[in-house]
Amino acid sequence: MHFCGQSGKLIVGGTAGQFVVCDLAKEAGEEADVPVIKSDLVTEKEGFVWKGHQPLLIRAGPFKMPLGFQPRAIVQISPPASINSLAFSESYGLVAAGTAHGLVIIDGIQHSLVMAKCTLSAQGDYSFMKMHLITKLNLTKLHLMCIIILFFTN
């Protein structure tokens, strides 16, 4: 989870490769569609087979925006692995999220995909993924990668 007190933006990541970008609203909004951004990190990786759970189903259609945090974009990353790291650049409105398979950067203002980068081995040996647990060091690397990318876009 990441919260920016200046902009009122809240970004919440989940365990099925999804994260939601919300803005703080002082009034209830009209019914609206929330844009869904999908990103597949491993389409170009031969031999990769995801054996985990399926992504969450996202409810289609407009819904009433309540008072408080209102969703502005929903991002679904495939494979649907847990979101390990989130970063936000208020000056550019960029949101970065990292998983065990790579990272995604979206434009939080226009709700579009900016970049998706797979961080899996180029050799195609994915057998380590079967029972691989992410260590604190790996989480730190993902978080630093997100921060570095956002820093150099400023």
Language model segments and positions:
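Conserved beta-strand element within WD40/beta-propeller blades
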Residues: F3, L10-G14, V95-G98
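WD40-repeat beta-propellers
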Residues: F19-L24, L103-G108, K117
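Surface loop/turn motifs at the tips and blade-to-blade linkers of beta-strand repeat domains
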Residues: V75-S78, C118
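Non-catalytic interaction/regulatory modules that flank or connect domains
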Residues: A87-G93, H101-G102
